[in-house]
Amino acid sequence: MELVLKDAQSALEVSEATFGRDFNEALVHQVVVAYAANARQGTRAQKTRAEVTGSGKKPWRQKGTGRARAGTVKGPIWRGGGVTFAAKTQDHSQKVNKKMYRGALKSIFSELVRQDRLIVVESFGVEAPKTKELKAKLNEMQLEDVLIVTPEVDENLFLAARNLYKVDVRDVAGIDPVSLIAFNKVLVTAEAIKQIEEMLG
């Protein structure tokens, strides 16, 4: 299959296995959920009554004081006591096989092509790290909500895009399922398309 280059009167031959496969919604959902889960820190921690610092001594005698009976100062009903069901550090990560991850990315790219959300250009960049210059270039192409994918990190482009709302710049190694579906359009250079094909096999 072919992808038409927007800035040139030509087309790029690409693999149908990468850019023309059926959309597997269940797989994409599983991979996106796993990606989000793997980003969670899960480092919260509270102490149970067994872990709280304090004496194990009975605070006062059982009878005769007129106060409610108490056996410990570390109980959950005491100020500074332990938490009944204390939250502990958790690992929320979900395992995703390489084959599944690549399959999800192929599904997403194929769906982007079908929905005319994937824009392929011969090259894309700015001469200086100027937001104004990049904004003008994107306005010319009628792009606002866009992810720009380049073969390697372009520092000028990255710095120019940093202050633009709903514009992000990634190299091929930095793309992920969440960022690909989060933007309305995905702008990719021809060289980046070749690298994506190699990466996804």
Swiss-Prot record:
Top-rank taxon: Bacteria
Record SUPFAM superfamilies: Ribosomal protein L4
Pfam families in UniProt: Ribosomal_L4 (PF00573)
One GO term of the biological process aspect: translation
GO cellular component: a single term: ribosome
Stretches the record annotates as Disordered: 45-71
InterPro entries xrefs: Ribosomal_uL4, Ribosomal_uL4-like, Ribosomal_uL4_dom_sf
Sample GO molecular function, one term: rRNA binding
Keyword terms of this UniProt record: Ribonucleoprotein, Ribosomal protein, RNA-binding, rRNA-binding
Subunit structure: Part of the 50S ribosomal subunit.
Protein family according to the UniProt entry: Belongs to the universal ribosomal protein uL4 family.
Functional summary from the UniProt entry: One of the primary rRNA binding proteins, this protein initially binds near the 5'-end of the 23S rRNA. It is important during the early stages of 50S assembly. It makes multiple contacts with different domains of the 23S rRNA in the assembled 50S subunit and ribosome.
Name by which UniProt lists this protein: Large ribosomal subunit protein uL4
Originating species: Shewanella pealeana (strain ATCC 700345 / ANG-SQ1)
Gene name of this polypeptide: rplD
